[in-house]
């Protein structure tokens, strides 16, 4: 299905862009955690390729694309080298990194959903794998770096929700036979914009409601 929407060269270019920006985020975290050069390279690879590897193993697309296309493997290493030598400059362009990361999130959730459907999965499972393609690398990155995955932390701006929206849009388009290059692009843009808005306005998922803490806060506000 994805092959019907974009030429192979366009698909490959979009994959490389997404892999590169995700690798940058992994390499930056490695620098902040004082990893050595090998650790920076490993974290860049894990972040960039983890979600896609998980998807391909689940749907039976073996060997995974990351092992059959040298460009997929080399791109994270290039990103790691860039961060290793120029990380102060890269840190100063964090806004640009966030923008590209949001774009990668949109691209990967759409590509992951369509590829899973192409391999015979149902719409719900395809959307779930689209989500995992988009966020799986980040989860593995945080685990390797010995951190609680930012995906499940309340003090992090929404990340999974934009990907869920994008993957759901693709699944609905498939269901109603409306998946085109335009609607796929719309899903990417929607995911991209939602992620940037979450960063701009610090949108976060709600936590479990605690009656006792709510009552204490209300009492404190009433106390003169």
Positions of the model-derived regions?
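Short, structured motif recognition centered on aromatic/hydrophobic residues
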Residues: 42-46, 53-59, 128, 132, ...
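Cytoplasmic-side transmembrane-helix entry/capping segments in multi-pass membrane proteins
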Residues: 38-46, 68-74, 94-105, 129, ...
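Small-residue-rich segments of transmembrane alpha-helices in multi-pass membrane proteins
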Residues: 44-52, 101-114, 132, 157-171, ...
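Intrinsically disordered, low-complexity non-transmembrane regions of multi-pass membrane transporters
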Residues: 1-7, 203-224
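Structural signature of hydrophobic alpha-helical transmembrane segments
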Residues: 7-19, 64-78, 122-135
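The first (N-terminal) embedded transmembrane alpha-helix
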Residues: 12-25, 43-46, 165-166
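C-terminal ends of transmembrane helices
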Residues: 23-33, 56, 81-94, 139-151, ...
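Helix-coil boundary and interhelical linker segments in multi-pass alpha-helical membrane proteins
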Residues: 1-10, 57-67, 111-126, 171-183
């Amino acid at each position: 299905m994805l092959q019907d929407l974009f030429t192979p060269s366009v698909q490959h270019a979009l994959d490389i862009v997404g892999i590169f920006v995700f690798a940058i985020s992994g390499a930056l975290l490695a620098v902040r955690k004082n990893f050595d050069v090998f650790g920076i390279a490993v974290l860049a690879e894990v972040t960039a390729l983890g979600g896609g590897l998980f998807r391909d193993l689940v749907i039976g697309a073996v060997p995974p694309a990351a092992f059959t296309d040298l460009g997929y493997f080399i791109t994270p290493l290039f990103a790691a080298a860039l961060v290793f030598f120029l990380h102060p400059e890269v840190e100063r362009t964090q806004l640009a990194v966030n923008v590209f990361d949001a774009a990668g999130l949109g691209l990967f959730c759409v590509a992951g959903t369509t590829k899973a459907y192409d391999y015979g999965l149902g719409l719900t499972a395809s959307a779930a794998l689209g989500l995992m393609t988009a966020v799986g690398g980040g989860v593995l990155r945080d685990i390797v770096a010995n951190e609680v995955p930012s995906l499940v932390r309340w003090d992090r701006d929404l990340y999974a929700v934009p990907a869920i929206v994008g993957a759901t849009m693709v699944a609905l388009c498939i269901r109603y036979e409306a998946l085109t290059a335009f609607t796929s692009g719309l899903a990417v843009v929607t995911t991209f914009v939602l992620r940037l808005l979450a960063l701009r306005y610090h949108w976060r998922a709600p936590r479990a409601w605690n009656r006792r803490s709510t009552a204490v806060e209300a009492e404190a506000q009433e106390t003169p």
